[in-house]
Amino acid sequence: MAYPLQLGFQDAVSPIMEELLYFHDHTLMIVFLISSLVLYIITLMLTTKLTHTNTMNAQEVETVWTILPAIILILIALPSLRILYMMDEINNPSLTVKTMGHQWYWSYEYTDYEDLNFDSYMVPTSDLKPGDLRLLEVDNRVVLPMDVTVRMLISSEDVLHSWAVPSLGLKTDAIPGRLNQTTLMSTRPGLFYGQCSEICGSNHSFMPIVLELVPLQTFEKWTASLL
């Protein structure tokens, strides 16, 4: 989860989020090197007393500033495309959960089980217990097994929403009349928080998401207790 004054991303708990963090560092390094080079050139231009007014043609320079940016763009595009394909790839999910956005709560349905569905509302500030997080706690958490591939089907009953859990690298739009899908897999158990990330009305800020990732045996006991 996020902390006050945090400047970086949340800790990654999924392979996709780890790849996104690596890509962020990779891209940031390239941007830093380019910015340093530009600043160095500007400094030289402002401090040097040498002038050259007879330059009419510089074929070598034009070649360099054409080829070098192309190489840099390729170095950015290749890992980006790799991650995009990884995020879209869905192979034999072990569990499917359907998520519907409403104004202003989420509803969940475990499609592999009969009659296993519930609504998830934010817990009001007046009902919070010691240790609970304001504006992030819900009355019904989404319990999922860790170390397995889970497919999320996401849509909306009314207006545009967006189902986002940053620590898992997830952000998928919930669009009325359209069913979007994404996958998640957590490498460790715990509670992971998210929120609606598409402005959807006056109570947009009060649509938290809480995923509780547990071992498979614990998940099976939880489902058995509800059926």
From Swiss-Prot:
Keywords: Copper, Electron transport, Magnesium, Membrane, Metal-binding, Mitochondrion, Mitochondrion inner membrane, Respiratory chain, Translocase, Transmembrane, Transmembrane helix, Transport
SUPFAM superfamilies attached to this UniProt entry: Cupredoxins (SSF49503), Cytochrome c oxidase subunit II-like, transmembrane region (SSF81464)
Catalytic activity of the protein: 4 Fe(II)-[cytochrome c] + O2 + 8 H(+)(in) = 4 Fe(III)-[cytochrome c] + 2 H2O + 4 H(+)(out)
Known role: Component of the cytochrome c oxidase, the last enzyme in the mitochondrial electron transport chain which drives oxidative phosphorylation. The respiratory chain contains 3 multisubunit complexes succinate dehydrogenase (complex II, CII), ubiquinol-cytochrome c oxidoreductase (cytochrome b-c1 complex, complex III, CIII) and cytochrome c oxidase (complex IV, CIV), that cooperate to transfer electrons derived from NADH and succinate to molecular oxygen, creating an electrochemical gradient over the inner membrane that drives transmembrane transport and the ATP synthase.
UniProt-listed NCBIfam families: CoxB (TIGR02866)
Subcellular location: Mitochondrion inner membrane
Keyword set includes Mitochondrion: yes
The protein's name: Cytochrome c oxidase subunit 2
Disulfide bonds: none
Any single biological process term in GO: ATP synthesis coupled electron transport
Chain sites annotated for binding Cu cation A1: 161, 196, 200, 207
Ranges annotated as spanning the membrane: 15-45, 60-87
Binding residue positions for Mg(2+): 198
Binding site for Cu cation A2: 196, 198, 200, 204
Mitochondrial intermembrane side: 1-14, 88-227
Documented EC number(s): 7.1.1.9
Family, per entry: Belongs to the cytochrome c oxidase subunit 2 family.
Species classification: Eukaryota, Metazoa, Chordata, Craniata, Vertebrata
